[in-house]
């Protein structure tokens, strides 16, 4: 196994040329291993709002494409939606990690995610030499959905109405594959459509997980604002099985926005995605180090 690649820091420009060459050489086995493979990355959290991390992310995505991998980006945008709602005098409400989405909120979600946020990401990637194309689940009939029936996690007899929040019924990845074949980088907004052409706000982690499954991705990486999954004492859990995850659900260790993230990650692992990682998006280049070295950042989810 190759020695770990040093974590990037502000001292990187001062590394001797020979050491820089060694770092690049250590990445070669991983470049060979993942050449031609699809990697689905859920982009969210601080990595989307910190300018330096935004730049790092865009450069990392372009590098992965240039060395022969096929990155697919699925993005969130919770803080941006909250800001837009605040300007309209509305406050976001969440139930079990899902945003309650009435008709007005759905309109905001569509123009924030499918417009402002998506175009910012596409622009960043293209500015550093990539060829990114923005999509929503409507494009190419990619993401079909229906209204999510949310049962209370403590009392199954209670069902919560979360408005136009959707659950995925089918994903047609044809448009994503066509873009990949032409060397584009797909950037997907988590908006689906129903049988009557109604729009649905879908959790971005769930979209990333389902898309990774249908694309038979080699890796699914979910960027977060935490080091990974933490136990009740705040200690990082670096490796979790399905059984351990069930226990963490039951005792309340996993809650809030982490609920759909872990559920989606586990579903992808059970459905054949080779490696599923929850990664600290606040660490510069953590995604790149996870792929191109034996450094471990965050939590790995296993189906067994």
Curated annotation (Swiss-Prot):
> Would the keyword Transferase be found if you checked this record's keyword annotation?
yes
Q: Which InterPro entries match?
A: AceGlu_kinase-like_sf (IPR036393), AcgluKinase_fam (IPR004662), ArgB (IPR037528), Asp/Glu/Uridylate_kinase (IPR001048), Glu/AcGlu_kinase (IPR001057), NAGK-C (IPR041727)
- Please state the Enzyme Commission number of this protein: 2.7.2.8
Sites marked Transition state stabilizer: 42, 261
Biological process annotations from GO: arginine biosynthetic process via ornithine; L-arginine biosynthetic process
Against Gene3D superfamilies, the record matches this protein to: Acetylglutamate kinase-like
| Residues reported to bind substrate | 77-78, 99, 201
Q: Which reaction does it catalyse?
A: N-acetyl-L-glutamate + ATP = N-acetyl-L-glutamyl 5-phosphate + ADP
Which Pfam family, an example, fits this chain?
Answer: AA_kinase
**Cellular component terms per the entry's GO annotation:** cytoplasm
The answer to whether the entry has keyword Nucleotide-binding is yes
Principal cellular location given in the protein's record: cytoplasm
GO function term, MF aspect, one: ATP binding
- SUPFAM superfamilies attached to this UniProt entry: Carbamate kinase-like
Pathway entry: Amino-acid biosynthesis; L-arginine biosynthesis; N(2)-acetyl-L-ornithine from L-glutamate: step 2/4
Tell me the domain of life: Bacteria
Task: Give the EC class as a word.
Answer: transferase
Keywords, alphabetical = Amino-acid biosynthesis, Arginine biosynthesis, ATP-binding, Cytoplasm, Kinase, Nucleotide-binding, Transferase
Q: Where is this gene product found?
A: Cytoplasm
Concerning PANTHER family, the annotation shows: N-ACETYLGLUTAMATE SYNTHASE, N-ACETYLGLUTAMATE SYNTHASE, MITOCHONDRIAL
Return the HAMAP family for the record: ArgB (MF_00082)
Q: Provide the family line.
A: Belongs to the acetylglutamate kinase family. ArgB subfamily.
Q: What does the UniProt function comment say about this protein?
A: Catalyzes the ATP-dependent phosphorylation of N-acetyl-L-glutamate.
Q: What is this protein called?
A: Acetylglutamate kinase
């Amino acid at each position: 196994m190759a020695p770990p690649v040093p974590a990037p820091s502000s001292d990187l420009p001062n590394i001797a040329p020979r050491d820089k060459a060694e770092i690049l050489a250590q990445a070669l086995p991983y470049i060979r291993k993942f050449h031609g493979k699809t990697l689905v990355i859920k982009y969210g959290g601080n990595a989307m709002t910190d300018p330096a991390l935004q730049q790092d992310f865009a450069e990392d995505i372009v590098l992965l494409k240039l060395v022969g991998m096929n990155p697919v980006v699925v993005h969130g945008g919770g803080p941006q939606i909250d800001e837009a709602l605040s300007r309209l005098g509305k406050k976001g409400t969440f139930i079990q990690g899902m945003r309650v989405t009435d008709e007005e909120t759905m309109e905001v979600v569509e123009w924030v995610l499918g417009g402002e946020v998506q175009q910012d990401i596409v622009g960043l990637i293209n500015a550093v030499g990539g060829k990114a194309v923005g999509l929503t689940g409507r494009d190419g009939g990619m993401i079909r959905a229906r209204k999510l029936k949310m049962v209370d996690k403590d009392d199954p007899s209670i069902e919560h109405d979360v408005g136009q929040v959707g659950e995925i019924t089918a994903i047609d990845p044809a448009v994503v594959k066509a873009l990949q074949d032409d060397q584009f980088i797909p950037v997907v907004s988590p908006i689906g459509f129903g049988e009557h052409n109604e729009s649905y706000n879908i959790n971005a982690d769930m979209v990333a997980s389902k898309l990774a499954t249908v694309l038979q991705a080699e890796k699914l990486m979910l960027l977060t604002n935490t080091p990974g999954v933490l136990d009740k004492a705040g200690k990082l859990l670096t490796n979790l099985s399905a059984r351990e995850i069930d226990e963490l659900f039951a005792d309340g260790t996993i809650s809030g926005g982490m609920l759909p993230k872990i559920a989606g990650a586990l579903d992808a692992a059970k459905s054949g995605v080779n490696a599923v990682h929850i990664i600290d998006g606040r660490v510069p280049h953590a995604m790149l180090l996870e792929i191109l070295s034996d450094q471990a950042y965050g939590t790995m989810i296993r189906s067994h």
